[in-house]
Amino acid sequence: MKKILLLNGPNLNMLGKREPHIYGSQTLSDIEQHLQQSAQAQGYELDYFQANGEESLINRIHQAFQNTDFIIINPGAFTHTSVAIRDALLAVSIPFIEVHLSNVHAREPFRHHSYLSDVAKGVICGLGAKGYDYALDFAISELQKIQLGEMMNG
């Protein structure tokens, strides 16, 4: 069974409480459980991990090496600051999609730059929790293309 990893960065554990006018009222647990059920219904395994510290996220990315097929990541504020998370994602060579609940381009100027976007398969922002659903759909679509290619070549 193909495995997808959902990573969430700093302060996302506060979803549902933190600035609901920006981030919505769903909790991270609500999102994780919904995505896990959606993935399982389509024959995929979804693991999830949230950390407020950069080191923990980097270590989890490293643990994904050779046992994870796709990463969905909302790096939170590390989007705009972390070359280290970028380097970790490049080191493991696992395709990933970047997700943001809010439209980072409609917010403060310092949020407009991402250290991940140019190496991600795609970026979804501003669609609230629904963005995670779209990211999962994309991840599954990409994995199905890979599986189809493997079947045709082997």
From Swiss-Prot:
Pathway this chain belongs to: Metabolic intermediate biosynthesis; chorismate biosynthesis; chorismate from D-erythrose 4-phosphate and phosphoenolpyruvate: step 3/7
Keyword line: Amino-acid biosynthesis, Aromatic amino acid biosynthesis, Lyase
Catalytic activity: 3-dehydroquinate = 3-dehydroshikimate + H2O
Highest taxon of source: Bacteria
Gene3D superfamilies: Dehydroquinase, class II
Function in brief: Catalyzes a trans-dehydration via an enolate intermediate.
Protein family: Belongs to the type-II 3-dehydroquinase family.
Protein name in the entry: 3-dehydroquinate dehydratase
Native organism taxonomy: Bacteria, Pseudomonadati, Pseudomonadota, Gammaproteobacteria, Pasteurellales
Gene: aroQ
